[in-house]
């Protein structure tokens, strides 16, 4: 039977071939806090405490998965997003801080407005829809998804959200076409999406834990048409029931920011479109307003 301190030392040694020492320390700490159900302060004080056989087995299984580049969020089965703790699995993207920035922008701009109707296109884990439903409780939020795995994961997150009547409504369908999913939508005030936007040629620069484990369907745009989903979104805005001067909020590929902006500034039903920076200063988001 090993102590917390001894397995920390051994795990850091094993992980050092793939991760920086700081990354490895963080991963080991998170695993131990989860497995032992203790806080960071308690972990610091538990260096000489022994692990039981089950805890040790669980820990080394997780370390082995880390050595195969598996994201720790998939290993743990959950990920934070704002004040939410979301179930995640390989069928959905792991929620990113940039996406949380986009959600915070929407909340800041629309807080206090009542009767909002919001559509999240390609909801994945449901992170955007749930964040907005939680922070804008007077809004009615709809979430569209086509992937079987993602639908199941989003529904699980919706069911456990505790939001009651504010829980998003999950719609099954494809954002590339207006199907039966659109028939029950009220006039929308906001469309939001974090669609696939990575170009396949960018794969060589991506971290193995993303490239080897997260769903390519949600990551990559078609090589022949990297702005496919953005054109589809502005076309949806022309075909779905929309309020006058409704808003569109999108996460995008900073390498294609100007091209993405051009898609919207050239659309006849778009009154205005603007790029917004993320916290690192990159053009990461687009906001557009429909004609009044």
Task: Annotate the PLM regions.
Residues 1-43, 48:
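Non-catalytic accessory regions of SAM-dependent methyltransferases
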Residues 32-108:
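Conserved AdoMet
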Residues 197, 289-292:
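C-terminal beta-strand of the catalytic ATP-binding
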Residues 197-229:
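Mobile active-site "lid"/loop adjacent to the S-adenosyl-L-methionine
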Residues 223-289:
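Conserved Class I SAM-dependent methyltransferase catalytic core
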Residues 31, 158, 194, 210, ...:
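Conserved RecA-like P-loop NTPase ATPase core
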Residues 98-205, 232:
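Conserved SAM/SAH cofactor-binding pocket of Class I
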């Amino acid at each position: 039977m090993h102590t917390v301190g001894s397995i920390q030392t051994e795990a850091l040694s094993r992980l050092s071939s793939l991760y920086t020492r700081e990354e490895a320390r963080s991963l080991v700490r998170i695993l131990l806090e989860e497995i032992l159900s203790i806080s960071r302060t308690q972990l610091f004080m538990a260096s000489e405490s022994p692990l039981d056989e089950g805890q040790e087995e669980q820990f080394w299984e997780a370390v082995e998965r880390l050595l195969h580049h598996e994201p720790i969020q998939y290993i743990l089965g959950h990920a934070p997003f704002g004040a939410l703790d979301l179930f995640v699995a390989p069928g959905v993207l792991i929620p990113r801080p940039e996406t949380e920035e986009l959600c915070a922008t929407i909340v800041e701009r629309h807080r206090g407005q009542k009767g909002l109707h919001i559509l999240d296109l390609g909801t994945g884990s449901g992170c955007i829809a749930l964040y907005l439903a939680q922070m804008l409780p007077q809004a009615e939020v709809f979430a569209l998804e086509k992937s079987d795995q993602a639908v199941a994961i989003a529904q699980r997150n919706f069911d456990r959200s505790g939001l009651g009547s504010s829980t998003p409504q999950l719609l099954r369908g494809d954002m590339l076409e207006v199907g039966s999913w659109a028939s029950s939508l009220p006039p929308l005030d906001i469309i939001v999406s974090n669609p696939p936007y990575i170009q396949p040629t960018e794969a060589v620069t991506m971290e193995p834990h993303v490239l080897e484990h997260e769903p390519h369907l949600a990551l990559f745009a078609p090589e022949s048409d990297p702005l496919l989903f953005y054109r589809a979104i502005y076309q949806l805005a022309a075909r779905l029931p929309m309020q006058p001067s409704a808003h569109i909020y999108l996460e995008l590929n900073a390498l294609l920011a100007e091209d993405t902006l051009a898609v919207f500034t050239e659309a006849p039903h778009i009154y205005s479109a603007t790029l917004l920076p993320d916290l690192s200063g990159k053009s990461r988001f687009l906001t557009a307003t429909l004609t009044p």
